[in-house]
Amino acid sequence: MINRLIQRIVPFSRPLSTVKKTMLTPFLESKRPQQSPEYDYSTLSNYKSFQIKHTTLNFLLSFEKSTVSGDVVFDLTTLKEAVKHIDLDTSYLDVNEVLVDDKPVEFKIEERKQPLGSKLVIAAELEAERQFKLRVKFSTTKDCTALQWLTPQQTSGDKPYMFSQLEAIHARALFPCFDTPSYKSTFTANIESTLPVVFSGIATGSTPNGESTVYHFKQDIPIPAYLVGIASGDLVSASIGPRSKVYTEPHRLDDCVWEFSNDVEKFIKTAENLIFDYEWGTYDILVNVDSYPYGGMESPNMTFATPTLIAHDKTNIDVIAHELAHSWSGNLVTNCSWNHFWLNEGWTVYIERRIVGALHGEPTRHFSALIGWSDLENSINSMRNPEKFSTLVQNLNDGTDPDDAFSTVPYEKGFNLLFHLETVLGGPQEFDPFIRHYFKKFARQSLDTFQFLDTLFEFFENKREILENVDWETWLFKPGMPPKPQFITTMADNVFSLVNKWIVKAQELKTTEEFSKEFSESDLSEFNSNQVVLFLEELVAQNCVPVESKIEWSKYSVASESLLSIYKKQVTESQNAEVVFKNYKFQTTARIQPSYQQLANWLGTVGRMKFVRPGYRLLNAVDRDLAIATFEKLKDTYHPICKQLVKQDLEL
């Protein structure tokens, strides 16, 4: 059992007690919500009526039925007003019984309000400041959006597998809860399964129970419901650092150990130097099965990760730096609603890149930012509703599904705002004390954008004129691309030079022999995998190419096929999923027809939405029949969220 680390006291430029309330700019004040933290309209619960002390989860996992059943117990206190009912979020749950202080009470499940689920209304006459225990007995159903259950045939071994994905509003599909990032609780979990279990907390032991085992966990730092993470399957583990293990299926263990060993502890120490000590005790990684829909999920103590990180060259490990950074931004300091998601993800990308910069140099940090800028452009250009979803501060108060708003915007637009602030305020030496101040001030709390702004203006009171000159309207509330910061482009310039050479020679040379004399495999030998990714992306986007020189690759088949032949080792034979995807993007753009079926086959081996969704869009653009047939064949192997979003992308 590992006790929570005690947070180191970090010196600030002035004591918190001396901070005075500072007005923002007139424009920002006109946008200020009536209350801060702003109310979360993505929950149906009456979370504002109670203070929560602790949550206990008692779960039984049934692979045979593909269900989780059991109960959840909340230790609650009413606030200064009496209440007549307790409202919880549910979604596709069967609720069997509700007890207040061990006494059964009446309840009803209201009609479903898509996409927010069904409100569970519990009759309870409770006076002000009353402490009580609320127990709800429940079971998930076949329509559960929080879990994916895999048969042995869908895994890499002979055992079934299950995992949860609760962000943004799917905790309510796993257990009745106050499903809002505004509401944080410590947790105890007792999870019974026939296979090993991992959880977003620290393991405290296990108890045999016939053919099953009850696995016990605790989470002593308050977290919101969406950060609860559960997985169960044929899991084994190995050490990858002094406070870290990796968990995965047996056949992947050696690759995972090689990929992650030594680097994870470096990441933790670098982040601690930037902010303050890691508070969660252990930092472990679960490398999930192929159908896992995200790059990673920052479940406290147990990062859930995609197997596409295993690139066999350590180049994708920056995703772990991202999920680790969430230990401060998102997990310790949390957005109060999904309108302010950038406070989680923008800060996390910023910290991730500070880690990368500290370990590999500032040009590497800036190169990562350039890649992110390109991703942001692609994301906004492909949005169905950029007017609504490309603003940094979102407005989901009309009941919009936060999953529909999910994009690169909160990550990259958020990062670029923080990078811009770092730059105009005087660089890291000026900005770093604010980072520590911000995370210290809001630790274990949830906040909105205006609380961030208030803290920023208060801390940099002596630089108010600089902050007043920031175009806050464009950065926070306008759709589209933000102003582009100045990046160090050294690593990108080498890529852009090679791209431009290919564009020119594609129009001049006519035979594969001529291309082989002009280009060679060594062109890419000094590039890291991220530079290869940018190279392939820029061959398609041609943002670095003069307008009058841009080409359509489909008209230059000899050039495109020569390129793939010359760079076979670094491109077509790569095991790095980032490179593989960009390779297919180039080939489909060049209308190389054999690649269509190859891409379709590859979509059956990955579940990460970063690749699956644009992969289907690429396929749809060149062969809609193949795209639809491939999706119909594979749809039940994807996570429910991924399946639904691809269905929307294909307009099915």
From Swiss-Prot:
<feature type="active site" description="Proton donor">
    <location>
        <position position="411"/>
    </location>
</feature>
<keyword id="KW-0645">Protease</keyword>
<dbReference type="InterPro" id="IPR014782">
    <property type="entry name" value="Peptidase_M1_dom"/>
</dbReference>
<feature type="binding site">
    <location>
        <begin position="165"/>
        <end position="167"/>
    </location>
    <ligand>
        <name>a peptide</name>
    </ligand>
</feature>
<dbReference type="GO" id="GO:0005634">
    <property type="term" value="C:nucleus"/>
</dbReference>
<dbReference type="InterPro" id="IPR012777">
    <property type="entry name" value="LTA4H"/>
</dbReference>
<dbReference type="GO" id="GO:0030163">
    <property type="term" value="P:protein catabolic process"/>
</dbReference>
<dbReference type="GO" id="GO:0008270">
    <property type="term" value="F:zinc ion binding"/>
</dbReference>
<feature type="binding site">
    <location>
        <position position="345"/>
    </location>
    <ligand>
        <name>Zn(2+)</name>
    </ligand>
</feature>
<keyword id="KW-0479">Metal-binding</keyword>
<dbReference type="InterPro" id="IPR015211">
    <property type="entry name" value="Peptidase_M1_C"/>
</dbReference>
<dbReference type="GO" id="GO:0004177">
    <property type="term" value="F:aminopeptidase activity"/>
</dbReference>
<comment type="similarity">
    <text>Belongs to the peptidase M1 family.</text>
</comment>
<keyword id="KW-0378">Hydrolase</keyword>
<dbReference type="Pfam" id="PF09127">
    <property type="entry name" value="Leuk-A4-hydro_C"/>
</dbReference>
<dbReference type="GO" id="GO:0061957">
    <property type="term" value="C:NVT complex"/>
</dbReference>
<comment type="function">
    <text>Aminopeptidase that preferentially cleaves di- and tripeptides. Also has low epoxide hydrolase activity (in vitro). Can hydrolyze the epoxide leukotriene LTA(4) but it forms preferentially 5,6-dihydroxy-7,9,11,14-eicosatetraenoic acid rather than the cytokine leukotriene B(4) as the product compared to the homologous mammalian enzyme (in vitro).</text>
</comment>
<feature type="binding site">
    <location>
        <position position="322"/>
    </location>
    <ligand>
        <name>Zn(2+)</name>
    </ligand>
</feature>
<dbReference type="GO" id="GO:0006629">
    <property type="term" value="P:lipid metabolic process"/>
</dbReference>
<dbReference type="GO" id="GO:0008237">
    <property type="term" value="F:metallopeptidase activity"/>
</dbReference>
<dbReference type="InterPro" id="IPR038502">
    <property type="entry name" value="M1_LTA-4_hydro/amino_C_sf"/>
</dbReference>
<dbReference type="GO" id="GO:0004301">
    <property type="term" value="F:epoxide hydrolase activity"/>
</dbReference>
<feature type="active site" description="Proton acceptor">
    <location>
        <position position="323"/>
    </location>
</feature>
<dbReference type="InterPro" id="IPR034015">
    <property type="entry name" value="M1_LTA4H"/>
</dbReference>
<feature type="binding site">
    <location>
        <position position="326"/>
    </location>
    <ligand>
        <name>Zn(2+)</name>
    </ligand>
</feature>
<dbReference type="Pfam" id="PF01433">
    <property type="entry name" value="Peptidase_M1"/>
</dbReference>
<keyword id="KW-0862">Zinc</keyword>
<dbReference type="Pfam" id="PF17900">
    <property type="entry name" value="Peptidase_M1_N"/>
</dbReference>
<dbReference type="GO" id="GO:0043171">
    <property type="term" value="P:peptide catabolic process"/>
</dbReference>
<dbReference type="GO" id="GO:0000328">
    <property type="term" value="C:fungal-type vacuole lumen"/>
</dbReference>
<dbReference type="InterPro" id="IPR049980">
    <property type="entry name" value="LTA4H_cat"/>
</dbReference>
<dbReference type="InterPro" id="IPR001930">
    <property type="entry name" value="Peptidase_M1"/>
</dbReference>
<dbReference type="GO" id="GO:0005829">
    <property type="term" value="C:cytosol"/>
</dbReference>
<dbReference type="GO" id="GO:0005771">
    <property type="term" value="C:multivesicular body"/>
</dbReference>
<feature type="binding site">
    <location>
        <begin position="293"/>
        <end position="298"/>
    </location>
    <ligand>
        <name>a peptide</name>
    </ligand>
</feature>
<dbReference type="GO" id="GO:0120113">
    <property type="term" value="P:cytoplasm to vacuole targeting by the NVT pathway"/>
</dbReference>
<dbReference type="InterPro" id="IPR045357">
    <property type="entry name" value="Aminopeptidase_N-like_N"/>
</dbReference>
<keyword id="KW-0963">Cytoplasm</keyword>
<protein>
    <recommendedName>
        <fullName>Leucine aminopeptidase 2</fullName>
        <ecNumber>3.4.11.-</ecNumber>
        <ecNumber>3.3.2.10</ecNumber>
    </recommendedName>
</protein>
<dbReference type="InterPro" id="IPR027268">
    <property type="entry name" value="Peptidase_M4/M1_CTD_sf"/>
</dbReference>
<dbReference type="GO" id="GO:0006508">
    <property type="term" value="P:proteolysis"/>
</dbReference>
<keyword id="KW-0539">Nucleus</keyword>
